[in-house]
Amino acid sequence: MTVETDKQTLGFQTEVKQLLQLMIHSLYSNKEIFLRELVSNAADAADKLRFEALVKPELLEGSGELRIRVDYDKDARTVTIDDNGIGMSREEAVSHLGTIAKSGTADFLKHLSGDQKKDANLIGQFGVGFYSAFIVADQVDVYSRRAGLPASEGVHWSSRGEGEFEIASVDKPERGTRIVLHLKEGEESFADGWTLRGILKKYSDHIGLPIEMRKEHYGEAADKPAEPEWEAVNRASALWTRPKSEIKDEEYQEFYKHIAHDAGNPLAWSHNKVEGKLEYTSLLFVPGRAPFDLYHRDSAKGLKLYVQRVFIMDQAEQFLPLYLRFIKGVVDSSDLSLNVSREILQSGPVVDSMKSALTKRSLDMLEKLAKDKPDDYATFWRNFGQALKEGPAEDYANREKIAGLLRFSSTHDTTGAQSVGLADYVSRLAEGQDKLYYLTGESYAQIKDSPHLEVFRKKGIEVLLLTDRIDEWLMSYLTEFDGKSFVDVARGDLDLGKLDSEEDKKAQEDLAKSKEGLASRIKAALGDDVAEVRVSHRLTDSPAILAIGQGDLGLQMRQLLEASGQAVPESKPVFEFNPTHPLIEKLDAEQDMDRFGDLSRVLFDQAALAAGDSLKDPAAYVRRLNKLLLELSV
């Protein structure tokens, strides 16, 4: 290395300072993870060089043998990670090592909890593993030169992790990046060949290019060669190209951690080779936890794409639908050209066929997880259930398959857990039941005792309880399952079909006819606030209820539209009353029109509250209620 020039001292971005403090104070409970992160970055640099060299072969500078070298010096207390990948220019070193360029930095820091294990996962997901070097090092030196730049445009970046870094220009004949870690006192154990080999074998055996270390020579010093001999300490073959029978679960798990930047294990994986008209290999994973930015519009999604084992791009979104954006993995195709671009991937029979097959394979993987490991599937559902609920709207062809993977709360399970599958629900249908009943609301606590459920409890009929904000929208696309239609128990004039006997139906009609006068009086009292007033067939214990018009938006959809600033179509509820309830009998007998109006209004407002809606004029409700209570106390 020659004399340094153009030396500057620069400050870290504020967010990096915060991150460094977390790292330095042992955020990772497992310190050896630093080597996995730095080797993973070196492998990415090799992938990027391979890809850019497809168009500019001169970037290889006459040497296409890509490798990573890990070395150590016990006396100097250093560990060195050296790669001959793409390298960095001076500007890139400042940008990549001095700032966190990825969007959502504030969100990332906001999600840090102080829990070492959880925060370590976040850091991996966020792709800032370079800073893990400061867990074991009190100084980090980076020497780099971008492929294609002259030797004189090498760069030396150095920092002690204390808020600033130095950067200077140096001569660097070889392209790529060399990172020298000056180990802290107490971390000398990492400057050891046996230790480093063990860590590399544990975390990086799946890396698809050689990770080399110096051969260890024992015995007489005279036997040592003048020049160091390097040997690969990993398999150096892409994991997905190996036969499934030869790959251990631990290898799949470490490969997942490498591509997903996740410290936890996946819940499931599927490794498949397709031969014939199309030829490609896929390795797909279901993560064990959701990234914090799963629902951000610009969150990282898609598979790593390789063509004939040459890395093409991260986050190729074209091979899976958006509702499966949580799936991680690799697809390696023999049918795409090496100069494929994102634009070319937008359409075409090859991509469409691969997308269809990979979607089916992902859903099959989830079906198997649900069947074989229900506890793990419950974990999956807690993390990704709402994303999967987008499926019926996006993927008509797989609607029934997706529906079978959905989980809901129901009146069958009093815990409120979303654990009921539609197949389970269908298996418990009452005799004569040909509809699938559901009720939407803000929370399980809010709707578990809803008046809308009274007649179903009386008849012993299970009702699905849908409490996610997306649920009402979901049900506008998911209209049937197993040949049976879904029915919202809060919508329209409830018809229980064969669940009501002919005698029951005749009695309901006669009762409704006998109360037409009362219905007209209540309608006059409530005026334009209701679309209709009628006798209810839903109620057994409550005096009144509000039903949604058959074509109107429910409360969830209205709230979603309001929250997004969109216009909400005006709709009026249907007021239904229970003619056998003592309060309704008292109302029917009331001759004082003012008092009748107040009673009708109080019943209307109470029905709105029971439905989870807010009152337009809560002060008027309280005033009327107080007035009626005073009259009762006289």
Curated annotation (Swiss-Prot):
Q: Where in the cell is it found?
A: Cytoplasm
Q: What is its main location?
A: cytoplasm
Q: Which family does it belong to?
A: Belongs to the heat shock protein 90 family.
Q: SMART domains given for it?
A: HATPase_c (SM00387)
Task: Describe its assembly.
Answer: Homodimer.
- What gene is it encoded by? htpG
User: Listed GO cellular component terms?
Assistant: cytoplasm
Q: Which key words tag this protein in UniProt?
A: ATP-binding, Chaperone, Cytoplasm, Nucleotide-binding, Stress response
Supply the name of the protein: Chaperone protein HtpG
Outline the segment boundaries, as ranges, of region: C. Answer: 560-634
Pfam families assigned to the protein according to its UniProt record, in alphabetical order: HATPase_c_3, HSP90
Q: What InterPro entries does this protein's entry cite?
A: HATPase_C_sf, Heat_shock_protein_90_CS, HSP90_C, Hsp90_fam, Hsp90_N, Ribosomal_Su5_D2-typ_SF
- Annotated organism of origin: Xanthomonas euvesicatoria pv. vesicatoria (strain 85-10)
UniProt-listed PROSITE patterns: HSP90
Region annotation (A) maps to: 1-342
Task: Return the annotated region ranges for B.
Answer: 343-559
